[in-house]
Amino acid sequence: SPPSQDFMRF
């Protein structure tokens, strides 16, 4: 699964 901070990189 991707990092928890990566999903807010949009």
Swiss-Prot record:
It comes from Sarcophaga bullata. Keywords: Amidation, Neuropeptide, Secreted. It comes from the Eukaryota. Its main location: secreted. The keyword Phosphoprotein does not apply. The modification Phenylalanine amide is found at residue 10. This is FMRFamide-3. GO terms for biological process: neuropeptide signaling pathway. Belongs to the FARP (FMRFamide related peptide) family.
